[in-house]
Every structure is written in structure tokens, then in C-alpha cells.
UniProtKB/Swiss-Prot annotation:
Binding positions for S-adenosyl-L-methionine per the UniProt entry: 40, 65-67, 90-91, 118-119, 133, 200
E.C. designation(s): 2.1.3.-
The keyword S-adenosyl-L-methionine is assigned to this record: yes
Species assigned in the record: Shewanella sp. (strain MR-7)
Keyword Cell division: no
One Pfam short name: Methyltransf_25
Role of this protein: Catalyzes the conversion of S-adenosyl-L-methionine (SAM) to carboxy-S-adenosyl-L-methionine (Cx-SAM).
Subunit structure: Homodimer.
Entry keyword set: S-adenosyl-L-methionine, Transferase
GO biological process, one term: tRNA wobble uridine modification
Protein name per Swiss-Prot or TrEMBL: Carboxy-S-adenosyl-L-methionine synthase
Catalysed reaction, written as an equation: prephenate + S-adenosyl-L-methionine = carboxy-S-adenosyl-L-methionine + 3-phenylpyruvate + H2O
MF-aspect GO terms: carboxyl- or carbamoyltransferase activity; S-adenosyl-L-methionine binding
Homology family: Belongs to the class I-like SAM-binding methyltransferase superfamily. Cx-SAM synthase family.
Length: 243
């Protein structure tokens, strides 16, 4: 997946629109997320490792909020020959178009059904693995529990949910220091103060992170019997829950 450099917020703008996964973002997304999310490559690679261990023959895998297909590709590499199907969903037409190009660049015997649509409308069944990779945080908070319930219902016993999210902290000093370390990470990756500030403004109304405890309560409340935080770097995390 060749990536152009993200310069979307490099020029000062009097009006910052809410962040959208439009064609501009899709064109630079690989660069944007690598420079913005610490540990992203490790998370993607490990999702493939989880798939190797949890995906059973003749079951389905769901990548909800698949963006350019990084997680889907990681999964597909690990489940060759299992007669499985991956359903990859994103509501951005621009993302889906580029995702299809990325998927087509690699030969695989694993079918991928790529859907441009709302993940809240997707029927989940016979699933051995569901991935929500930095997706839930963009849903309205009041819609999150219903989606988790739908995922739990559609997972087979022993099935796995991988949930990666930016998280917030109730402890103000912890929130402050980890947020500052994340900003330093972005500065070290070449983002200017202007870019950081303008993107923060763009995300303010569309991304609403939860605390880790809220995530755990939501998952266990819907019936998941096993939960663990398996990755955290600053205020970015990835969790697993087993049905």
C-alpha cells in the first residue's frame, strides 16, 4: 500500500471542518495513521496472529471499519486454506475503493466480501473473529453497546473480538502526561504544531474515546467471559474479548 504524505492540515485554515474519511484522507491514510497511532503496525501484525489462533474452518471473519484493508490483509495471510470468508465493511466509498485495490494486489484463496455501508447495519453470524480497529470511537456513544451486543450474538462460542481504541483516563495527571507523550510522538514523526492543533479541532466532535473501564464493563455486560488489554502505548490500546 503506497502512501502519499499527509499534509491535509499543513496550511492554516480559518474554518476547520469535522474530520471525514473522504478522498483526501483515503489518499494519505496509511501515512497518517502510521505517524499518528503509536504501535499501529504491531497491532495490525498481531491481529493476524490472533486470526491464526482463533479462526476456525468454514467460519466468517468481520473487519468492521476496514479502512484501506490493513487488518483484512493481515488476517487473510494467516488463514489460507481454511475455507473461510472475510466480510470487510467501511462507510467511506473512498476507503472502500482503495481497499479493493489493495486487496486485489495480493493473490489469496480466502474470499473477501467488501461492503460500503454502516457497520451498525451488518448482520453478523457464524463468526470466529470480529475486528473493530479504531472504529468504535467514531460511533455515537449511545450506539456502541448495541453494536457490541450484535457482535457477541454473532460470534461462535470461543470466538474472539479484537477492539483497538484511543482511550481516555479519569485520572487527570495520567491523562495529561500520556496525551503529551502522544503529541511528542506526532512531533517526532514530522507533524507541526499547526497540523496537530488543526487535526485535533477536526476530530473534536467526531471521535469520543471511552475509558478502559467503560470498554470492559460494556464487553462483560454483553456476556463476554474473558477480557484483556493486550496492547497499550500512551493513550492508544487494543483489547481482546472471548465469547
Amino acid at each position: 500500500m503506497n502512501a502519499s504524505q499527509d499534509t491535509i492540515y499543513a496550511q492554516a485554515s480559518e474554518h476547520i471542518s469535522d474530520f471525514q474519511f473522504d478522498n483526501r484522507v483515503a489518499g494519505v491514510f496509511s501515512d497518517m495513521i502510521r505517524r499518528s497511532v503509536p504501535g499501529y503496525t504491531q497491532i495490525i501484525n498481531t491481529i493476524g496472529d490472533f486470526a491464526d489462533r482463533f479462526v476456525k474452518p468454514n467460519t466468517q471473519v468481520y473487519d468492521l471499519g476496514c479502512s484501506l484493508g490493513a487488518a483484512t490483509l493481515s488476517i487473510r495471510r494467516q488463514i489460507q486454506g481454511r475455507d473461510c470468508r472475510i466480510i470487510a465493511v467501511d462507510n467511506s466509498e473512498s476507503m472502500v475503493t482503495r481497499c479493493q485495490e489493495n486487496l486485489s494486489a495480493y493473490v489469496s484463496d480466502t474470499e473477501v466480501e467488501l461492503i460500503c455501508g454502516d457497520i451498525r447495519d451488518i448482520h453478523i453470524e457464524n463468526a470466529s473473529l470480529v475486528v473493530l480497529n479504531f472504529t468504535l470511537q467514531f460511533l455515537p456513544p449511545e450506539d456502541r453497546e448495541a453494536l457490541i451486543a450484535k457482535i457477541y450474538y454473532g460470534l461462535n462460542p470461543g470466538g474472539l473480538l479484537v477492539l483497538s481504541e484511543k482511550i481516555r483516563f479519569d485520572d487527570a495527571p495520567i491523562q495529561s502526561v500520556l496525551e503529551e507523550l502522544h503529541l511528542d510522538f506526532k512531533r517526532a514523526n514530522g507533524y507541526s504544531e499547526l497540523e496537530i492543533s488543526q487535526k485535533r479541532s477536526a476530530l473534536e466532535n467526531v471521535m469520543k474515546p471511552d475509558t478502559l473501564s467503560i470498554h470492559q464493563q460494556r464487553l462483560t455486560g454483553q456476556g463476554f467471559s474473558h477480557f484483556s488489554l493486550w496492547f497499550q502505548c500512551f493513550n492508544f490500546s487494543s483489547m481482546v474479548a472471548i465469547k
